[in-house]
């Protein structure tokens, strides 16, 4: 696990951009993408660059259940706004939040991941150590699945909605086994509220109670964190 500590999220975005550029320069064709406030500075750096993804495929981590793709709170809408409108990919895959048969949608998305092995997957980390929507206690061997979101995750996402009651209670998510199949993982974390999760992920035991700790077992992980998120690490990086 390569750990890079930067001053703030803006600097983290520049480091994240370097990881994307290096992957593209080395022939990466499939990029696993994430949403939320964490990757936006990396996406901004990409948008303002001359990187070309027109021959590449994107596969997103997750999507809320019950939200239409054109809803401004959907992850499809987020990706269009923050990346795809400026940097289109040859093809882009996200779970279908309005799928009438969730079980069939899970199988479809597993097939997408199998047919498009991910070269670089970007991740954030929740305050409880979740990655994607894989909450504490999620089985390590799980692939795409429907998740009942925890109260802490609903609360954390409420800032994006008119009220906490509007936050969806379920989501489709790549599983931990799906994520671990990626060739290279890039995890970003910014802010003091991520410090406990970051410490557990890097220095704590590998435990299902902190899903991100599974990354200790992956052969190629880059972690980009700001000084606040790194504040509880006992070792200097």
Swiss-Prot record:
Its EC number(s): 3.5.99.6
Record SUPFAM superfamilies: NagB/RpiA/CoA transferase-like
Top-level taxon of the source organism: Bacteria
One GO biological process term: carbohydrate metabolic process
GO molecular function: glucosamine-6-phosphate deaminase activity; identical protein binding
PROSITE patterns per UniProt: GLC_GALNAC_ISOMERASE (PS01161)
UniProt pathway annotation: Amino-sugar metabolism; N-acetylneuraminate degradation; D-fructose 6-phosphate from N-acetylneuraminate: step 5/5
InterPro entries the record matches: Glc/Gal-6P_isomerase (IPR006148), Glucosamine6P_isomerase (IPR004547), Glucosamine6P_isomerase_CS (IPR018321), NagB/RpiA_transferase-like (IPR037171)
Matching Pfam families: Glucosamine_iso
Catalytic residue positions: 62, 128, 130, 135
Top-level enzyme category: hydrolase
Record key words, sorted: Carbohydrate metabolism, Hydrolase
Gene3D superfamilies found in the cross-reference section: 3.40.50.1360
GO CC, one annotated term: cytoplasm
CDD domains in the cross-refs: GlcN6P_deaminase
Catalysed reaction, written as an equation: alpha-D-glucosamine 6-phosphate + H2O = beta-D-fructose 6-phosphate + NH4(+)
Function: Catalyzes the reversible isomerization-deamination of glucosamine 6-phosphate (GlcN6P) to form fructose 6-phosphate (Fru6P) and ammonium ion.
PANTHER family reported for this sequence: GLUCOSAMINE-6-PHOSPHATE ISOMERASE
Family from the record: Belongs to the glucosamine/galactosamine-6-phosphate isomerase family. NagB subfamily.
Name listed for the protein in its UniProt record: Glucosamine-6-phosphate deaminase
Organism for this UniProt entry: Lactiplantibacillus plantarum (strain ATCC BAA-793 / NCIMB 8826 / WCFS1)
Gene: nagB
């Amino acid at each position: 696990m390569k750990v890079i500590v930067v001053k703030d999220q803006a600097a983290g975005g520049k480091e994240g951009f370097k990881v994307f550029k290096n992957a593209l320069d080395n022939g990466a064709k499939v990029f696993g993408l994430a949403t939320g406030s964490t990757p936006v500075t990396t996406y901004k750096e990409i948008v303002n660059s001359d990187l070309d993804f027109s021959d590449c495929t994107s596969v997103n981590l997750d999507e809320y259940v019950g939200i239409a793709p054109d809803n401004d709170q959907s992850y499809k809408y987020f990706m269009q706004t923050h990346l795809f409108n400026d940097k289109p990919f040859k093809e882009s895959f996200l779970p279908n939040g309005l799928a009438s048969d969730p079980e069939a949608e899970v199988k479809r998305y597993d097939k997408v991941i199998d047919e498009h092995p991910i070269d670089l997957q970007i991740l954030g980390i929740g305050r409880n150590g979740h990655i994607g929507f894989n909450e504490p206690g999620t089985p390590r061997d799980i692939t795409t699945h429907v998740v009942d979101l925890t109260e802490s995750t609903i609360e954390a996402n409420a800032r994006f909605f008119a009220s906490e009651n509007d936050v969806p209670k379920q989501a489709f998510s790549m599983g931990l086994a799906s994520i671990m199949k990626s060739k290279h993982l890039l995890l970003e974390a910014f802010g003091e509220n991520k410090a406990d999760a970051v410490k557990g992920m890097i220095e704590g035991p590998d435990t299902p109670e902190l899903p991100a700790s599974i990354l200790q077992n992956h052969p190629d992980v880059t972690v980009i964190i700001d000084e606040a998120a790194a504040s509880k690490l006992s070792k200097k990086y």
